[in-house]
Amino acid sequence: FYKFQEEAIEEVSFGENVIIEAPTASGKTEAFLIPVIQKIKKESSTKGVFAVFVYPTKALSRDQHPKILKFAEKIGIDVQVFDGDTNQVERREIVENPPHILITNFDVLHYHLWHQTKFSSLLSTMKVLVVDEAHVYSGIFGSNVHYIIKRLKRICSNKIQFVAASATLEDAKNFCEQLFGVKMKIVHGS
């Protein structure tokens, strides 16, 4: 492990809202995935979606899914992707048997929250929201995402822990605190 990964794992494990800022391909995914998996195992009675991992594109979420699955499935943690390419049979299965970790994007979250679908009710059990590539959520898109996050906070029965990951974020702490509406700790990678 790199020093920043150890620090991030510790902070996320303690329940802190964390920004993981490190270069591309330096192990940011492991830095948030390992403590989330540990939390799921610790709360083994957990029913419903425990964590939502948001990626800016379907391609990136589909690329990350096998990597996340490799860690999770060995210890019985279910991980599913729900996006525009998820077929009706898979969608029904996700709604009827919610995974521990759900991989999606903000467009899907917005649509289902807005239309109050069965899928949106799955989100009420969420305890951790991970936003990868957080730097893309700036400008008008970022303000829309801020309001999606506010709606998520309203429907969740738990206080949500926020984790952001990015390789390139100018003034990352201020940016993420505005995006999520909470105080955040920053962990820097080399």
Q: What role is predicted for each listed range?
A:
Residues 170-172:
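Canonical AAA+ ATPase core
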Residues 2-156, 163-165, 175-179, 185-190:
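Conserved P-loop/Walker A NTP-binding site and adjacent catalytic elements of P-loop NTPases
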